[in-house]
Amino acid sequence: MREINVSQITDVIEKLCIEANEHLPEDVKCAIKTCRACEDGEIAKGILDNIIENFDIADNENVPICQDTGMACVFLEIGQDVHFVGGDLTDAINEGVRRGYDKGYLRKSVVKDPVRRGNTGDNTPAMIYTEIVPGDKVKITVGPKGFGSENMSQIRMFKPSAGLQGIKDFILEVVETAGPNPCPPMVVGVGIGGTFDKCALLAKKALMRPLDSQNPDPFYADLEKEMLEKVNKLGIGPQGFGGKTTAIGLNIETMPTHIAGMPCAVNINCHVTRHKSEVI
């Protein structure tokens, strides 16, 4: 049994909130630059040049990449041999978010109630997702999620008779409906299987995966490639002005499901696909 003081969790989350908002992952930057080299249209190339300039400035000056610094989504992979001491884990996570958004001068975007609103003033509470894994370590991932793209996301509870074609059509429908709203080029996270809630979580976890990775199952790896090509053929293009680059990545995550269902969720992210991780 390994003891970890929750103050360590707070410190790491504070740091990750700031870093994730100021520095895009290298795989995302590389994907954007690769797409820039493939674009033909002057408008599309100009927009991608602006995007590249923007994340370069954010890197060099340590400022947020986007004014929407997101709702803090915190993923914890907790080793089963870990015992947290020194306080409540949830409180420690929220304190890390509170400090990070204050210290980093990040916009506070969370309201107390979904209907009656009222800003909490510190970007808490975080959306917390935990998974118990073997070992005595804790992996923390912070993925700030903006809502221009989150609002474009959808889930559909298919019957198995919809088949693979139903899933393909749904992915394209969601992206086409989103159009310019999620600040393309976008990243598309797809979850297939599980229950209503688990399917949506799979789609969000797909957004945390590096864009230069692929699903370990060759069937779904091929589907990722096929659907990314089809999404880009929609021609929405950078910021919706047309072009070859509607999406810079499409990741699929799956899990077993009930014999009577085939849930599919599509979680859209903008080109500012932010996530940072650290292991304690």
Where are these regions (language model features)?
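Non-transmembrane, aqueous-exposed alpha-helical and coiled segments at domain scale
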Residues: 1-280
